[in-house]
Amino acid sequence: MYEQAIVIRNDLKMGKGKMAAQACHASIQAFLHAQKISSSAVSGWMNEGQKKVVLKVNSEKELLEIFKNVNIEGLPCSLIRDAGRTQIEPGSLTAVGIGPEKEEKISKVTKDLKLL
């Protein structure tokens, strides 16, 4: 089975709409990266219904650690930096998108995270 994981910073106290927008940015950017490096995973994910899991971290440090580990594993990913036009400071790191890729590959990095 394939999935995509989106990891959101919970400490920024973004509103629900802002959080949803950041998750969408992370999802789309990771998907575009996956198209370039893992087209078979993208095809499998599309055929299986495009499962997404949204998880949380509580600091920028935790978010960067996830992003580092995702890159070490060679998974398609994205790191989202907010423009700062609305609720949070410009340049704030808000989310990481991972995949689509096989669930077991993503869970190597995300297994200890809680659902948002």
Swiss-Prot record:
It is an enzyme of class 3 (hydrolase). InterPro entries: Pep_tRNA_hydro_II_dom_sf (IPR023476), Pept_tRNA_hydro_arch (IPR034759), PTH2 (IPR002833). Keywords: Cytoplasm, Hydrolase. It catalyses: an N-acyl-L-alpha-aminoacyl-tRNA + H2O = an N-acyl-L-amino acid + a tRNA + H(+). One of its GO terms (cellular component) is cytosol. GO terms for biological process: translation. It holds the Pfam family PTH2. Its main location: cytoplasm. One of its GO terms (molecular function) is peptidyl-tRNA hydrolase activity. Its EC number is 3.1.1.29. It is found in: Cytoplasm. Belongs to the PTH2 family. The natural substrate for this enzyme may be peptidyl-tRNAs which drop off the ribosome during protein synthesis. PANTHER family: PEPTIDYL-TRNA HYDROLASE 2, PEPTIDYL-TRNA HYDROLASE 2, MITOCHONDRIAL. This is Peptidyl-tRNA hydrolase. The gene is pth.
